[in-house]
Amino acid sequence: MEITKEIFSLIAAVMLLLGSFIALISAIGIVKFQDVFLRSHAATKSSTLSVLLTLIGVLIYFIVNTGFFSVRLLLSLVFINLTSPVGMHLVARAAYRNGAYMYRKNDDHTHASILLSSNEQNSTEALQLRAKKREEHRKKWYQND
């Protein structure tokens, strides 16, 4: 009985450590990435996983060491994992619609049609026009960069 308690405590500690490490990677990504979209990706994906691992580790620790099952931890785990991606999606969508700066490795729009379905008419031209408008809007707002 004591050995299983130690094993579960070790599993909880490893999950807490992994959650902390992934949160650190998320923080580095937020600082390092160039635009809103990449930063929101770093914040959402890895932070959601780090919160998931951390809360599961805390839940296991409480169950094993105190015999206490926390419904609050379980509910917070569910709500954070449901609302965090949706919230960041809305932030990224608003940034895209407002013409926020979008980092691109190259400005070549010749392969833009691979992102669109084959049944859309004039999709390449529409995508290139949107990219030009976004670039003009970006230059207007971020001309000091």
Curated annotation (Swiss-Prot):
Primary location recorded for the protein, binned into one broad class: membrane
Keywords associated with the record: Antiport, Cell membrane, Ion transport, Membrane, Transmembrane, Transmembrane helix, Transport
Coiled coil regions, renumbered to chain: none
Gene Ontology cellular-component terms listed: plasma membrane
The keyword Lipoprotein belongs to this UniProt entry's keyword annotation: no
Compartments in which it is found: Cell membrane
Membrane topology category: Multi-pass membrane protein
InterPro entries in the record: PhaG_MnhG_YufB (IPR005133)
Pfam families given in the database record: PhaG_MnhG_YufB
GO molecular function, one term: sodium:proton antiporter activity
Transmembrane segments: 11-31, 51-71, 72-92
Domain of life, source organism: Bacteria
UniProt similarity note: Belongs to the CPA3 antiporters (TC 2.A.63) subunit G family.
Subunit structure: May form a heterooligomeric complex that consists of seven subunits: mnhA2, mnhB2, mnhC2, mnhD2, mnhE2, mnhF2 and mnhG2.
UniProt cross-references to NCBIfam families, sorted A to Z: CPA3_mnhG_phaG, PRK12586.1, PRK12674.1-2
Protein name per its UniProtKB record: Putative antiporter subunit mnhG2
Designated gene of the protein: mnhG2
